[in-house]
């Protein structure tokens, strides 16, 4: 997992934009690369790139390997928007995820999305209801022996929620 304090430089962002958006159709490689480095982008840029990514993947977006990459990018965008308390962008990512309908075969992503929805509720709606969803998601990860994932989200929310006036 990445250090959330690291940000890409303007020069790096320009290079990445030129690379990503001169390619007409994104495949698995571009999605994997974008998914890996996109956490370095500030939210406005992540949002812009994600919208453009959805257009670039229209043709190949339904392939199983590409679908997982796209879903991961959208869920990461949702977390990023919630962290910055940008409800409009969080709602956009939620809409795109709901529209794509996470399949049962991607249970891990469904659990992470449930955690993200709990975070959304904690920040924008009903705090206790959201915290319950987060804890339930982490418990499911623990029960399924996704130890690293459960630990990551426990630490993530210990940091995020202790630094906020909820």
Task: Indicate where each model-derived feature is located.
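Extended alpha-helical scaffolding segments
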Residues: 76-132, 141
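C-terminal non-catalytic interaction modules
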Residues: 128-166
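Alpha-solenoid helical repeat architecture
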Residues: 26-33, 64-73, 103-113, 144-155
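Helix-turn-helix repeat elements of alpha-solenoid scaffolds
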Residues: 5-14, 43-55, 84-95, 130-133
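Hydrophobic, aromatic-enriched interface-forming segments
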Residues: 13-61
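"A position-specific structural signal for the A-helix of alpha-solenoid helical repeats
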Residues: 1-2, 32-36, 72-80, 109-120, ...
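Amphipathic alpha-helical segments of tetratricopeptide repeats
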Residues: 15-21, 54-61, 94-102, 135-146
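Alpha-helical linker/edge segments of TPR/alpha-solenoid repeat scaffolds
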Residues: 5-6, 42-48, 79-81, 117-129, ...
